[in-house]
Curated annotation (Swiss-Prot):
Official protein name in the record: Trichodiene synthase
InterPro entries found in the cross-reference section: Isoprenoid_synthase_dom_sf, TRI5_ascomyc, Trichodiene_synth
Species annotation: Gibberella zeae (strain ATCC MYA-4620 / CBS 123657 / FGSC 9075 / NRRL 31084 / PH-1)
Gene responsible for this protein: TRI5
Catalytic activity: (2E,6E)-farnesyl diphosphate = trichodiene + diphosphate
E.C. code: 4.2.3.6
Lineage: Eukaryota, Fungi, Dikarya, Ascomycota, Pezizomycotina
Length: 375
């Protein structure tokens, strides 16, 4: 395994944060903790239900970690939506992360997908059955156009995860494959469309801005994620078909060249995002900017991305990029480093155990006859 290109990563991260003029002021600390706990508490109770526990079959520690990661992403990035919308989106995106981390072959459960869909039957695939049950809770927040984007993008995501089960990075010379797969599993349209709940935006009035935002967000969101994920995925066996690694295979280039390709595309997308919306409806621009800054804060602060390891490694270095990166990291930590113990309680496993005990008690109650009830 090659050594991680720390200096290049620092330079790339600094350029990105400078391009978007990073300055996360989305919340006070009290507001952040309040929203985190509200979204987490509702989502935790959802996943503690017996049906979810039985059908997902996810290791409790992994489910807990996934839920905490997603709640952080949604609350930090969707700073303008209601707490109820945050909670429902947190549940939806936790389902997607659970699928992304799974290794089950979906083929057998997908044989009758369309027939079941057309007939209104429950899907054989347990993930689809649960996601479809929750979808109305998500879609109630959005107009029909945004809702269609959420549905379609979620279907694309499932297909992208299916492709990833084969650990196939593309054939050499297949230049379109890396971006094809990344668009498929990136949830860019789902994210881009879920920024515009109908209680804040009339999608008919803002149709052009929303459509453009979905188009721009598709690339910006996934490319930033790929850059910020590059460190954690660098030597992870599960993540060897990342966009950067697929660039190496399909374009037949070096790892440094692939990272530079991703860097240039991300920076260009960041420039576009700021330029396109800077003179549009102020509420639209504010929503996009809050998302961008919150999304970066989440990556810098969430343990899943391990960027604190980079910080610890370079904090005593005297290079310009190291100093700038550490300044940005500390800026993010000042607003976004909130210990899970302050908001992620109770644990899903604890809630599930309480439910299980209550179900046992209910089952053990004596059944009274109709005569006894009358007496």
């Amino acid at each position: 395994m090659e050594n991680f290109p720390t200096e290049y990563f620092l330079n790339t991260s600094v350029r990105l944060l400078e391009y978007i003029r990073y300055r996360d002021s989305n919340y006070t600390r009290e507001e952040r903790i309040e929203n985190l706990h509200y979204a987490y508490n509702k989502a935790a109770h959802h996943f503690a239900q017996p049906r979810q526990q039985q059908m997902l079959k996810v290791d409790p520690k992994r489910l807990q970690a996934s839920l905490q990661t997603i709640v952080g992403m949604v609350v930090y990035s969707w700073a303008k939506v209601s707490k109820e919308c945050m909670a429902d989106l947190s549940i939806h995106y936790t389902y997607t992360l659970v699928l992304d981390d799974s290794s089950d072959d979906p083929h057998p459960a997908m044989l009758n997908y369309f027939d079941d869909l057309q007939a209104g039957r429950e899907q054989a695939h347990p993930w689809w059955a649960l996601v479809n049950e929750h979808f109305p809770n998500v879609l109630r927040h959005f107009g029909p156009f945004c809702s269609l984007n959420l549905i379609r993008s979620t279907m694309d995501f499932f297909e992208g995860c299916w492709i990833e089960q084969y650990n196939f990075g593309g054939f050499p010379g297949s230049d379109d494959y890396p971006q094809f797969l990344r668009r498929m599993n990136g949830l860019g349209h789902c994210v881009g469309a879920s920024l515009w709940p109908k209680d804040l935006f009339d999608e008919r009035k803002h149709f052009l801005e929303i459509t453009s935002a979905v188009a721009q967000m598709e690339n910006w969101m996934v490319w930033v994620n790929d850059l910020m994920s590059f460190y954690k995925e660098f030597d992870d066996e599960r993540d060897q078909i990342s966009l950067v690694k697929n660039f190496v295979t399909c374009h037949e280039i070096t790892l440094d060249e692939a990272l530079e390709k991703l860097t240039q595309e991300t920076l260009h997308s960041s420039k576009q995002m700021v330029a396109v919306f800077s003179d549009k409806d102020p509420q639209v621009m504010d929503t996009i900017e809050c998302f961008m800054h919150g999304y970066v804060t989440w990556h810098l602060c969430d343990a899943r991305y391990r960027l604190h390891e980079i910080y610890e490694k370079v904090k005593d270095q005297d290079t310009e990029d190291a100093k700038k990166f550490c300044k940005f990291f500390e800026q993010a930590a000042n607003v976004g480093a909130v210990a899970p113990s302050e908001w992620a309680y109770p644990q899903v496993a604890q809630l599930a155990n309480v439910r299980a005990k209550d179900d046992v008690k209910e089952a053990q109650k004596p059944i009274l006859s109709s005569i006894e009830l009358v007496e």
